[in-house]
């Protein structure tokens, strides 16, 4: 019920604290299945100071718009492109929808179809429904990467583009993006790479010597990439990113908003009003940590993943779904539903997929948290 009179700030705050006591918190060490993390303290400071900035009305916040452009350029550089075109958006879902919309609008096909792996994120289902694009699902190989031959067999005159995943939601698998890029070039189709998770992991992991295939704009067939700074980038939610290789993709989805300050403003994002502070936080975190800072974060996460995978193998009745590629470790057990329910009853925030449990080594996850989890897991599995 909407209150007749207001309430003291402290009283309201105390009520909020009471109502959210059921929430798991990142600092508890219990959240092991999330692809998000507690934001970096510096990013929180940026959000607080610039909370009023609205990138949906860039004529009012000209400086913030320029900073967003610089953030997009830095993300483009990270992804192998000197200058890209895009925006800091609400997350991977919006970014993926924008990519599909750009492909559809440029293709001009009456019955558009998009080919994507069966491992693709559910945001593409939303995109298909919203944009009237039929989704054509490609089969996976035994290692859970997309079957490139099956992708090729599904190409028709109605195909508007192809999707590859660089860090699948369930297993952290990276598709054979080089092969998909070659295929896209052969057929004159654009390739979108969903690197919502892998975008802030793979460049640094490769620099550390991990054997991961190329996935970004270094491959000529890649025309757009989704990358989420609010995951391993440690920027507060919401902060996703969509980067296009060429301006024509942004132009294809831009709508004129003539009444905004500054006059003829073109908007390409789904949201009108957009939090400028989050885009500024993306810029600030990249400036603050740099490549070496993020490489150190990824080093710890990858080493923790390798250690954790090894410890899982020591527990009878527990098995890896596959060796980890990124900082995601997924495993199965007998009586998985019972194990999952008991782990959750003990307070663990885990992500259960079809047939396995996913653990994500985000920056807030420490070895002592995992050691406690392993003790609980072994106890539950042994009955």
Curated annotation (Swiss-Prot):
Which residues get modified to N6-(pyridoxal phosphate)lysine?
A: 231
Q: Enzyme class, one word?
A: lyase
Identify the cofactor(s). Answer: pyridoxal 5'-phosphate
Record Pfam families = Pyridoxal_deC (PF00282)
Q: What superkingdom heads the lineage?
A: Archaea
Q: What is its EC number?
A: 4.1.1.11
The record's PROSITE patterns line, in alphabetical order, gives: DDC_GAD_HDC_YDC
Gene3D superfamilies attached to this UniProt entry: Aspartate Aminotransferase, domain 1, Type I PLP-dependent aspartate aminotransferase-like (Major domain)
Q: Which cysteines are joined by disulfide bonds?
A: none
> Known InterPro entries for this protein?
GrpII_AminoAcid_Decarb, MfnA, PyrdxlP-dep_de-COase, PyrdxlP-dep_Trfase, PyrdxlP-dep_Trfase_major, PyrdxlP-dep_Trfase_small, Pyridoxal-P_BS
What keywords appear on the UniProt entry? Decarboxylase, Lyase, Pyridoxal phosphate
* One GO BP annotation of this record: coenzyme A biosynthetic process
Q: Which molecular-function annotation in GO is an example for this chain?
A: aspartate 1-decarboxylase activity
Q: In which pathway does it act?
A: Cofactor biosynthesis; coenzyme A biosynthesis
Q: Could you tell me what reaction this enzyme catalyses?
A: L-aspartate + H(+) = beta-alanine + CO2
Record carries keyword Lyase: yes
* Alphabetical list of NCBIfam families matching this protein: tyr_de_CO2_Arch (TIGR03812)
Q: Which family does it belong to?
A: Belongs to the group II decarboxylase family. MfnA subfamily.
Q: What does this protein do?
A: Catalyzes the decarboxylation of L-aspartate to produce beta-alanine.
Q: What is this protein called?
A: Probable L-aspartate decarboxylase
Instruction: Tell me the lineage of the source organism.
Output: Archaea, Methanobacteriati, Methanobacteriota, Thermococci, Thermococcales
